[in-house]
Amino acid sequence: MTFTLPEMVQRSSFSCFSRIVRRPVASTIRAISGQYSGMAVSNDSSCAEEIAAVDKRIVVHNGLVKKNGQIRFGAAEHISFVLLEAMKADPDIRCLIEFSAPEEFVENMEDAGLEVTLIRKREESIAETVRTAIASSRKFPDVLADLSNKKNVTIEVLGKTPADVLSKMDMVL
C-alpha cells in the first residue's frame, strides 16, 4: 500500500499522539494546570495548515492525558507558528507541547538541566518573539517559557520527536 506524504504524516501523527495521550502522568501534572493547550508534529512543513495537531485541548483525566478533539492538519494555529519558527532555526525540531504551569515549574525545568528561555509575548508577533528568544539563547532552547500571563507561565517544550518531548517532560515530572 502506498501513501502520499500528507497521509504518512497523518498516520505517524496519529500513532505518536496515541502514545502520548494514553501515557500515565505523575500526579504533579494536575497541579500544573489540568489541561494542555496542545501538541503539534510536523514533517517538513512550511505553513500552519501542514502541521498535525490536536483540535481542541488535551486534558488530564483520571491520571491519563487524553485529547478532546481529533488530530488534524491546521488544528492549532498558535503552536504551529511557534513550531515553524523553531524549525527555521533548527530543522531537526519537529514537535512541541504547550501547557500552563506555576512559575516554580520553570525553575524545576532549569534544575533538571533543560535549556529554558524566558519570553514575553506582548507586543511582537509570535514569529518575532520566537526568533528573538532563540537568538538570545546560549544554545537552542528545550523550553520557551512565556511570562506574560500573571496567573501561570505558558510553557512550550520543543523536541525532535514526540519521544524527545516526552523525555524532556519526564525530567521534571
Task: List each language-model region with its residue ranges.
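Conserved mixed alpha/beta catalytic, RNA-binding, or beta-rich assembly cores of soluble enzyme
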Residues: 3-173
